[in-house]
């Protein structure tokens, strides 16, 4: 039995200041149980693992981004933070490659123990400069709604200052997914961002349906980012220069 799944839904962003800006796009994501990748490669006709296909997943798109095992990467970082890795299961919510291309602004690793309790969450954030930052949170209480907060440590948008705080609210994946991020500065809320989706099985039939609905989704994501940035610039929102160059940073937040 395959536990990995497809979630079809929407991404929403609303900026509150200095000017209101709103957009919404239809997307689909995969929630991949990392231990199933080889099985998915064999059983799902349109999906490949670390090789080209209509839809594919590559280890080098996440973690250390050097093609090494993501399970090993998660285990390594959990051990550094004294989080148990005994009999854990790891699921990753992300966009897949479509026709060999992907850009994931946010990927979420969900780590479960042998009792199916959520014990850690890793938020992996990327920007369009090829950089990545991962925020690691220990889950102290496994509720259906998980809430985390931290200061912003990574340059994402050139239209938002670094002196901000993130507030994450996520539902444990089930029939639906929900990932919500509120961003605040000292004067109040700047940005609301969310991804919502409804679950279907990850198999050849539903993957083909998802592709037909979104044949150029991953290309559209990167184009949409630049298009929305252009609209912010036209609205006169200040462009903030980026000074520090990083590759893969990781911070522990609790």
Please identify what each model-predicted range represents:
Residues 1-254:
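Mature, function-bearing regions of proteins
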């Amino acid at each position: 039995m395959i536990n990995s799944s497809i979630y079809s839904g929407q991404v929403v962003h609303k900026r509150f200041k200095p000017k209101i800006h709103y957009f919404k796009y239809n997307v689909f994501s995969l929630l991949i149980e990392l231990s199933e990748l080889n099985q998915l490669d064999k059983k799902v006709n349109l999906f490949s693992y670390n090789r080209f296909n209509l839809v594919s997943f590559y280890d080098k798109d996440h973690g250390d981004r050097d093609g090494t095992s993501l399970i090993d990467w998660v285990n390594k970082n959990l051990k550094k933070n004294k989080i148990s890795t005994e009999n854990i299961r790891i699921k990753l919510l992300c966009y897949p490659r479509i026709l060999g291309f992907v850009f994931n602004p946010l990927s979420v690793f969900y780590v479960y123990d042998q009792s199916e309790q959520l014990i850690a969450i890793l938020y992996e954030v990327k920007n369009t400069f090829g950089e990545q930052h991962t925020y690691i949170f220990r889950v102290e209480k496994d509720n259906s709604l998980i809430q985390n907060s931290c200061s912003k440590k990574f340059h994402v948008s050139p239209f938002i200052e670094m002196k901000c705080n993130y507030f994450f609210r996520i539902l444990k994946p089930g029939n639906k997914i929900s990932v919500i991020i509120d961003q605040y500065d000292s004067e109040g809320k700047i940005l609301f961002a969310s991804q919502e989706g409804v679950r279907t099985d990850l198999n050849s039939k539903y993957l083909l349906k998802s592709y037909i609905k979104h044949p150029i989704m991953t290309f559209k994501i990167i184009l949409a980012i630049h298009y929305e940035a252009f609209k912010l610039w036209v609205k006169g929102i200040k462009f903030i220069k980026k000074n520090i160059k990083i590759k893969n940073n990781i911070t522990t937040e609790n």
